Amino acid sequence: SRCSLRSIRPARSSDATSCGRLIAYAARQLAAPMFGDGDPVLAERRFCGLFELPGGLWSFYLADVAIEDETVVGVIGHYPRPISVGREIRTFRAAIQVYGVIGTGLLFWRLRHLVSARPSDTSRAYYVSNLAVATHARGRGIGSGLMHHAYEAAQRAGAETVGLEVLIDNT
């Protein structure tokens, strides 16, 4: 069955575990070394923790989920750019809660190349930060439906560009 817009809704804090697991699995080649200090279980736990905390860039506040039989089968994080100073502060605070002070410093050091890869003019940009679909639900248009949903949100926000970072091994 194809993913319809009726099956996509805003993410909730109660979706944190499902979404964290989906994102950690989708980004597994990068997740363990970058987010879990080499440990995939720790990376998943940290993704879940970051997703659960309100207000940051990795928060459920900035995500939508695809639902099938009352289960989260896909997640997409998306938001307009530029990011407010308040949102950046909340992101940093969330990271400190999940990683601690030293761990947050290490995380942002590891992510420095991603930040520098973004376009400098973000005045009318929109950004897709994460997209993950459960393995058993792939091939049915769920990822495409989530991307279309985010694209429509970008249009409503008046964005002129939409940015997406992908990993070389995304499938």
Describe these PLM feature segments.
Residues 40-63, 67-68, 115-117:
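Active-site rim helix/loop that mediates acceptor-substrate recognition in acyltransferases
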Residues 135, 139-152, 156:
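Conserved acetyl-CoA-binding loop-helix of GNAT-fold acetyltransferases
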